[in-house]
């Protein structure tokens, strides 16, 4: 990528860093992890959780959500100005699961947000530690990406459900900052922009007045983020057109959908980070591991090593398969919802199946679910190999893909050819090539038609043995090409509902 030199690495975004060298970055990411771990330990003490209960992923999610809610200033202000019955704007809480007399019980806890903020700051040497908060948001986002297929959201904005591989980060809150923007897929950015344009079409005052100026600058900023994710001049030029439009409307929506479709073959750069649940960091810190001193990276071997030595449990519903639940969480931990399943199976060392074949629902348990028959089991989050996370889309070529998901967005920098269903993608590009963007459209279509199936992405890159910490001996995997490569294949995953 040409502009790579001007970009901060995503560890710097993660830690609000000015330019830092690799050692400083590893230390500041480590410091962030330490803070999350210390906070988690303190919360387990407050809630009187046993070691086992503290390693339960459902408890981890509740505790993470509590601190995110305590620091959500806009929502907190909104709640205070619009009081609703039975909701105390100053309190936050959720379900905590405890083992009582040999069975799992749900207990709803409620805390002052002020108290949670105090505990969080204390764990983070008095700072607000926004990087740590964003880290937890990205973990939740990765878990959503693995659990739900956002068909409805795609259809509502006029996009095609088969474009789900572009939807990474679609449930990230707006306040997730630069680190959040880095992990958003092309489709996510396009969807945010289309929603904005639609509001402008329906509400005459949306772009006007004092507020309209802020709206406009947010619009242009989002266009620039999206432009920065594209890797070809024509796609970027198209984003300039959309950004400079005097009065964004249907023409811009058309252009955005066109550019999103094109990203199925001419993939954008989307960052991937392994963000783990707080219940992994807590026990590691309490066992005396010093992340800041040792250094930590979200994109190298560190998360793999940490998961190799972690014990995490999950509640399991009566008809769920614990191995499938493990796969779901493993994929979320490595931000791998849209990666090629054949590569994931190779790295994990066990077969990774498409979402529709998994007998498991989401990790969170709804408040109306019956606890009587809940069991718990260990999540198997270990891997056979490790690989470096990528922030590029890899170059492009084609291969048979599926009815559900017709392209992948690579997570790991490992040599392979990237599957996508060229005939299906190209079929969407007949017709409209007139208008302001016609030359760019023609150029983009020409590049897509030139994409070759035998081209290899990430040439020479491989996976590594877990003993190979310095990544000296890459192992280039070989794949069974007859296997299905897409996770959301002709899928029946539940929809994501806020």
Curated annotation (Swiss-Prot):
Region (Disordered): 1-21
UniProt record similarity statement: Belongs to the influenza viruses nucleoprotein family.
Assembly mode: Homomultimerizes to form the nucleocapsid. May bind host exportin-1/XPO1. Binds to viral genomic RNA. Protein-RNA contacts are mediated by a combination of electrostatic interactions between positively charged residues and the phosphate backbone and planar interactions between aromatic side chains and bases.
Cellular component aspect of the GO annotation: helical viral capsid; host cell; host cell nucleus; ribonucleoprotein complex; viral nucleocapsid
Its job: Encapsidates the negative strand viral RNA, protecting it from nucleases. The encapsidated genomic RNA is termed the ribonucleoprotein (RNP) and serves as template for transcription and replication. The RNP needs to be localized in the host nucleus to start an infectious cycle, but is too large to diffuse through the nuclear pore complex. NP comprises at least 2 nuclear localization signals that are responsible for the active RNP import into the nucleus through cellular importin alpha/beta pathway.
KW Ribonucleoprotein (keyword) present: yes
Any one GO biological process: symbiont entry into host cell
SUPFAM superfamilies reported for this sequence: flu NP-like
GO molecular function, one term: structural molecule activity
Motif (Unconventional nuclear localization signal): 1-18
Protein known as: Nucleoprotein
């Amino acid at each position: 990528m040409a502009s790579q030199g001007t970009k901060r690495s995503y560890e710097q975004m993660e830690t609000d860093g000015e330019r830092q060298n690799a050692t400083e970055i590893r230390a500041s990411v480590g410091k962030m992890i330490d803070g999350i771990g210390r906070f988690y330990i303190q919360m387990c003490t407050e809630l009187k959780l046993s070691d086992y209960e503290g390693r339960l992923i459902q408890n981890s999610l509740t505790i993470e959500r509590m601190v995110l809610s305590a620091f959500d200033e806009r929502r907190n202000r909104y709640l205070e100005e619009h009081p609703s019955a039975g909701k105390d704007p100053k309190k936050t809480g959720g379900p905590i699961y405890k083992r009582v007399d040999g069975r799992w019980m749900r207990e709803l806890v409620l805390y002052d947000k002020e108290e949670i903020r105090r505990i969080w700051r204390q764990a983070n040497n008095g700072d607000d530690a926004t990087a740590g908060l964003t880290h937890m948001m990205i973990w939740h986002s990765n878990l959503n990406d693995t659990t739900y297929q956002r068909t409805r959201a795609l259809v509502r904005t006029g996009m095609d459900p088969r474009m789900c591989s572009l939807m990474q980060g679609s449930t990230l809150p707006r306040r997730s900052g630069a680190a959040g923007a880095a992990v958003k897929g092309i489709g996510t950015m396009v969807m945010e922009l289309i929603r904005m344009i639609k509001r402008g079409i329906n509400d005459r005052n949306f772009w006007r007045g004092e507020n309209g100026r802020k709206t406009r600058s947010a619009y242009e900023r989002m266009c620039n983020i999206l432009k920065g994710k594209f890797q070809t001049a024509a796609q970027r030029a198209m984003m300039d057109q959309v950004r400079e439009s005097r009065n964004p409307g249907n023409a811009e929506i058309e252009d955005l959908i066109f550019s999103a479709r094109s990203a199925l073959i001419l993939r954008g750069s989307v960052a991937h980070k392994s963000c783990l649940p707080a219940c992994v960091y807590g026990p590691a810190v309490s066992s005396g591991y010093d992340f800041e001193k040792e250094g930590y990276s979200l994109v190298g071997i560190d998360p793999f090593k940490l998961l190799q030595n972690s014990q995490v449990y999950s509640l399991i519903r009566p008809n769920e398969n614990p191995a499938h639940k493990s796969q779901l969480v493993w994929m979320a931990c490595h931000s791998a919802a849209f990666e090629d399943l054949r590569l994931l199976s190779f790295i994990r060392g066990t077969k990774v199946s498409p979402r529709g074949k998994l007998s498991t629902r989401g990790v969170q348990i709804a408040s109306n679910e019956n606890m009587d028959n809940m069991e718990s089991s260990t999540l198997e989050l270990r891997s056979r190999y490790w690989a470096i996370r990528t922030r590029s889309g890899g170059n492009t070529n084609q291969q048979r893909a599926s009815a559900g998901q017709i392209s992948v967005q690579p997570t790991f920098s490992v040599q392979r050819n990237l599957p996508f269903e060229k005939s299906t993608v190209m079929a969407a590009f007949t017709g409209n090539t007139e208008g302001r963007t016609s030359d760019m459209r023609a150029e983009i279509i020409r590049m897509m038609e030139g994409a070759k199936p035998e081209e290899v992405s990430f040439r020479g890159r491989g996976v590594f043995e877990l003993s190979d910490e310095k990544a000296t001996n890459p192992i280039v995997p070989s794949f069974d090409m007859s296997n299905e490569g897409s996770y959301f294949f002709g899928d029946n995953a539940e929809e994501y509902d806020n």
